[in-house]
């Protein structure tokens, strides 16, 4: 749905979550996680060896770019009484976001294809990383970022109450995939136990948070600028940034102030520094205004 709280701080990006630290706003979960890992190195969940870091990065891309999430969406139980299909405003909004309209007929037609692709994903985890009976992907004592990056679409399908019966039981069950089902259950248990140890978050409304972000006097993070970039962008140029996979209409405009191979930062009209990953995001020069 439209994001008035994000519009309030000059961010046209539509996806959530985002993270704000002072006057810095970080978009996309992958960038948020890497930023938190850098800020709190003593509490990191990152793998300890270069090879395992590489495996974790591959999982980070696999669940999104590898089609796992796309095929999980095809399995949404559209037939339920409280299904998203009953909300016309939501359907209209998602059509703008994703470029296609969700219908019962279309959802039903897509289920066999979604199930077939997900069976491949279930098979992969069951017969490789989890095959030896380990608790976690990298055989760690606790879940690592590799587990977080790998598990979330499976957790959504298997434990979210709104996704109940999304997976046909004859193809997806604990007898056929005992190790994967046990892994997801372990992760959910660990997640719930960790939540119990944390203080209860203080929920604030969007206007309050927007004002806090805009009014903060904390100096924004400094990101270097790669002048020798492949696009020939110059520091200080006006640009627009948008996702390149879906949600391309959610553009965020501003002045280009930071650029590396992995990250781009703009200063928007509210004076906020908005950070995006380079992967799956497009940078375009802002249209020049004609002079009369």
What are these regions (language model features)?
Residues 66-182, 189:
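GST-like fold's C-terminal all-alpha helical module
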Residues 1-94, 104, 233, 240-243, ...:
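GST-like domain detector, emphasizing the conserved glutathione-binding G-site
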Residues 169-226:
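Catalytic cores of secreted or luminal carbohydrate-active enzymes
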Residues 1-13, 166-185, 189, 247, ...:
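Solvent-exposed, charged interface segments at domain starts and junctions
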Residues 33, 37, 57-60, 122, ...:
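Non-transmembrane alpha-helical segments in soluble domains
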Residues 207-251, 255:
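Acidic, Ser/Thr-rich low-complexity intrinsically disordered segments
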